[in-house]
């Protein structure tokens, strides 16, 4: 755990050295909620009936979708980006010279990215609340648990992408395909009931479909977690199966990279 915290701190120090960029990025995110508000207001009459079981308010519906997508984007993209960067600048070799475990290495690489995503999420939620989004704050803990479970279903996919970087120095189209399909089929901008029936069937293979439905019912409607038991069970299934697959894939890629001596080369 200490090793992971040290990596997280080092990455925060690197980001903190670009203070102007950090400030403008933060302010830009806070302001970006304004056009989302006006767009959602314009579409509210059209969307109200299709989202009646997920809050009925399109502004809150859209904000929750964008927040969830930001987290899965981090889950699938942060790890392989860190490996690519650290191999390229030689810092991975230096880190591996220390007595760090692979779980600590992965946690350290992901920790800073998720901390930054949490900060951005809070700014977006505060801005949305100030503009009148209906958020049931008493369900914040339950919503965080649901979001965490959704992220746990996507982290294994990010680990597989990192394994591709270790073995082949490229992820190929995998991360883009995952995020693209999740955005298109997972219900980020619209409920899955609004898409053609054959695509709606395909959305059942996307973890975000279950995560967003449960999150909106809880954080917008104020429903208890038990109302989304089926969706939460599906997320647990995705997380368990994909974790087992990613462990095997990453182990093989790590062993191959060490034998080939390519961990310090890009």
Task: Give the positions of each predicted feature.
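Hydrophobic transmembrane alpha-helices and immediately adjacent juxtamembrane helices
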Residues: 1-266
């Amino acid at each position: 755990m200490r090793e992971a915290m040290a990596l997280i701190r080092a990455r925060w120090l690197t980001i903190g050295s670009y203070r102007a960029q950090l400030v403008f990025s933060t302010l830009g995110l806070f302001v970006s909620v304004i056009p989302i508000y006006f767009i959602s207001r314009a579409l509210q009459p059209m969307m109200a009936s299709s989202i009646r079981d997920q809050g009925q308010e399109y502004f809150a519906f859209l904000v929750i979708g964008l927040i969830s997508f930001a987290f899965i984007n981090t889950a699938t993209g942060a790890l392989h980006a860190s490996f690519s960067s650290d191999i390229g600048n030689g810092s991975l070799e230096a880190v591996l010279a220390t007595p760090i475990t692979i779980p600590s290495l992965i946690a350290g690489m992901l920790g800073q990215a998720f901390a930054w995503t949490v900060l951005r999420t809070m700014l977006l939620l505060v801005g949305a609340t100030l503009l009148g989004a209906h958020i049931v704050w008493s369900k914040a803990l339950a919503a965080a648990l649901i979001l965490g479970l959704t992220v746990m279903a996507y982290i294994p996919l990010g680990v597989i992408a990192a394994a591709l970087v270790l073995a082949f120095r490229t992820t190929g189209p995998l991360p883009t395909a995952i995020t693209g399909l999740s955005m298109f089929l997972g219900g980020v901008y619209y409920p899955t009931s609004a898409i053609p029936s054959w695509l709606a069937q395909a959305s059942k293979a996307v973890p975000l479909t279950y995560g967003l439905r449960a999150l909106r019912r809880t954080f917008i409607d104020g429903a208890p977690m038990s109302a989304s038991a089926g969706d939460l069970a599906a997320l647990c299934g995705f997380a368990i199966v994909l974790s087992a697959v990613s462990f095997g894939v990453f182990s093989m890629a790590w062993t191959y990279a060490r034998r080939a001596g390519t961990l310090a080369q890009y």
